Amino acid sequence: MGLLKAVVVLNGAADVKGVVQFTQEGDGPTTVTGKISGLSPGLHGFHVHALGDTTNGCMSTGPHFNPLGKEHGAPTDDNRHAGDLGNVTVGTDGTVEFSITDSQIPLSGPHSIVGRAVVVHADPDDLGKGGHELSKSTGNAGGRLACGVVGLQG
């Protein structure tokens, strides 16, 4: 299958913007690298959502991508949504550069994330362990600050 590449351009609330790149070699894990700016310092939930629909901004991207019907969790948990990528840690300058490697977000096949949305949230993802009523579905990560649709690159 060779190397697959995809990209998301994030846009949203106020000055939040960024670019996230995805690469996958064969059936191996997907590497996610990105830079996002315009965020408040601290942790922000970072997820793949089920739909690539941004007609109503980030609100129309649906729930977390969850093809296997599991509960929300941390990226290292066995019981997690495929789209649960945890948090990105934003510095005092409002920017974050990150690299994540994950085996549940392929760029091809029946569970491909191509055509789905990536969303950056206002608050930290509690990784399903916060005890809040939303912990097991969204990680209680709050509002959707920015989003974009995953598209294949040549």
Curated annotation (Swiss-Prot):
Binding site for Zn(2+): 64, 72, 81, 84
Catalyzed reactions: 2 superoxide + 2 H(+) = H2O2 + O2
Cysteines engaged in disulfide bonds, as pairs: 58-147
Entries under Gene3D superfamilies matching the protein: Superoxide dismutase, copper/zinc binding domain
CC annotations in GO: cytoplasm
Cellular compartment(s): Cytoplasm
Cofactor note: Binds 1 copper ion per subunit. Binds 1 zinc ion per subunit.
Superkingdom assignment: Eukaryota
Pfam families in alphabetical order: Sod_Cu
List of residues binding Cu cation: 47, 49, 64, 121
The protein's required cofactors: Cu cation; Zn(2+)
PROSITE patterns linked to this entry: SOD_CU_ZN_1, SOD_CU_ZN_2
GO molecular function: copper ion binding; superoxide dismutase activity
Keywords carried by this UniProt record: Antioxidant, Copper, Cytoplasm, Disulfide bond, Metal-binding, Oxidoreductase, Zinc
EC number from the UniProt entry: 1.15.1.1
SUPFAM superfamilies according to UniProt: Cu,Zn superoxide dismutase-like
UniProt xrefs under CDD domains: Cu-Zn_Superoxide_Dismutase (cd00305)
InterPro entries in the cross-refs: SOD-like_Cu/Zn_dom_sf (IPR036423), SOD_Cu/Zn_/chaperone (IPR024134), SOD_Cu/Zn_BS (IPR018152), SOD_Cu_Zn_dom (IPR001424)
Record function comment: Destroys radicals which are normally produced within the cells and which are toxic to biological systems.
Family to which the UniProt record says this protein belongs: Belongs to the Cu-Zn superoxide dismutase family.
Complexes and interactors: Homodimer.
UniProt xrefs under PANTHER family: SUPEROXIDE DISMUTASE CU-ZN -RELATED
Protein name, as recorded: Superoxide dismutase [Cu-Zn]
Species per Swiss-Prot/TrEMBL record: Pinus sylvestris
